């Protein structure tokens, strides 16, 4: 079950995330769960696999914003790093980084099972 304690153990800055959700725990947890269903996780991996850098950037950037607003630090940091690599068109294979973000999402989803 997803709780504030499981989010803290995951590495989220729960106090910051709660602050953005008017200190409403139920609302914050609902927003976290909604973020885990964001289709941009899959879009990011697919775009990275097909080397569609524009689509990968859009998905990574969108995820970075959502995850940062909820203070899901491990995922937002990874999405932020990938966003900047894509923004700068840094040469490289983006698939491992995209899959790492997806794996973090799956790890957090498993905590909600």
What are these regions (language model features)?
Residues 1-113:
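Two-component system phosphorelay core
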């Amino acid at each position: 079950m997803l709780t504030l304690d499981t989010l803290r153990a995951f590495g989220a800055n729960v106090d910051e995330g709660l602050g953005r959700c008017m200190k409403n725990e139920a609302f914050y947890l609902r927003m976290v769960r909604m973020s885990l269903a964001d289709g941009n996780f899959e879009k990011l991996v697919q775009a990275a696999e097909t080397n569609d850098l524009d689509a990968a950037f859009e998905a990574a950037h969108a995820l970075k914003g959502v995850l940062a607003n909820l203070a899901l630090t491990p995922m937002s940091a990874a999405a932020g790093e990938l966003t900047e690599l894509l923004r700068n068109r840094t040469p490289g294979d983006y698939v491992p980084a995209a899959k790492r973000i997806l794996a973090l999402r799956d790890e957090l989803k498993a905590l909600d099972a």
